[in-house]
Amino acid sequence: MATYIVGDLHGCFDEFQLLLEQANFDPQYDELWLTGDLVARGENSLACLRYVKALGERATVVLGNHDVHLLSTLQGIKAVKPKDKVDAIFEAEDRLELQNWLRSRPLVAQHPVHQFLLVHAGVSPEWDLATTLACAREVEAVLQGEQFADFLAQMYGNSPDQWRADLQGIERWRYALNVFTRMRFCYADKRLDFDCKLPVEEAPEGLKPWFELDNPFYRQQPIIFGHWASLIGYQTPDTIYALDTGCVWGNHLTMLRWEDKHIFTQKRLNLD
C-alpha cells in the first residue's frame, strides 16, 4: 500500500488521471490525500468532485478557499464568476449531494500512521498541534451544522489578522478559516497578510512565508499544503512540503508518494 498526496487540482481532471496512471494508483490498496481546491479555473471541476467523492474512505481531501467559495455560490451568497468555470456543477443532478459531501470535508487532516498534517494553506505561527486541530474541528462543526449558510455569509474578510486565545464566535472562526485556506505571508509579529501573492523573493520587506516564522511546531512533524503556486522552486524547510505547482496556470500537477518521497508530475494539457 502506498500513500499519495496531490496538490491543488483546480478542475484539471485529465492531468489528475494521467498523474494517477503514472503511479499505477490502485484505490483497492493505495490511499490518496489531496490539498484542496478541487474546483475552479480548470475545465472539469465537476469530474474532480465526483471522482474524489467516489473514492470514499480511500481519499482524504481538505477544504481549500475555492472549495469554500463554491459552497457560498451554491447557497446564493456570492455570484458565480465565469472564470471559475463551475457552471456544470450548478447544472448537475447530484449538486446537492456534492455540496453536502464537500462541506463535510475537514480543514486539517492528520495521517494516522505517518503523522503528517495536511492543510490547504497553512498552520498559524501562533498555534501548536492541539490548537490547530481544535480550531479546525470548531469551524468544521459550523460548516457541517444547520447554520452553515449564515457562517458562509459572514466568513469573508481579513479581520482579525492576529490570533488571540480569547477570540470567540465569527471572529475566531474567520481567523481559523483564513489560516487554513488563505494564508501565505505573515509579518514578524505573526499578523497575517492577505495582499501579497508574489514569489518569496519578490515580497515586500517585512513579510515572510508563514512556515519561516519561529514556531517549534513547524519542526516537530511534517506539514503538507497547497494553495501557493508561486512557491515553485523555493526551498522550504525539511518538514514543510508545498505541493501546489500551478497546473491550472500552465505549469504542472504534482503528487508525492510519502513512503519514498518520490515526486510525480504531469504537465498541463491543451491550454486555451
Swiss-Prot record:
<keyword id="KW-0378">Hydrolase</keyword>
<dbReference type="Pfam" id="PF00149">
    <property type="entry name" value="Metallophos"/>
</dbReference>
<protein>
    <recommendedName>
        <fullName>Bis(5'-nucleosyl)-tetraphosphatase, symmetrical</fullName>
        <ecNumber>3.6.1.41</ecNumber>
    </recommendedName>
</protein>
<dbReference type="InterPro" id="IPR004617">
    <property type="entry name" value="ApaH"/>
</dbReference>
<dbReference type="GO" id="GO:0008803">
    <property type="term" value="F:bis(5'-nucleosyl)-tetraphosphatase (symmetrical) activity"/>
</dbReference>
<dbReference type="InterPro" id="IPR029052">
    <property type="entry name" value="Metallo-depent_PP-like"/>
</dbReference>
<comment type="similarity">
    <text>Belongs to the Ap4A hydrolase family.</text>
</comment>
<dbReference type="InterPro" id="IPR004843">
    <property type="entry name" value="Calcineurin-like_PHP_ApaH"/>
</dbReference>
<comment type="function">
    <text>Hydrolyzes diadenosine 5',5'''-P1,P4-tetraphosphate to yield ADP.</text>
</comment>
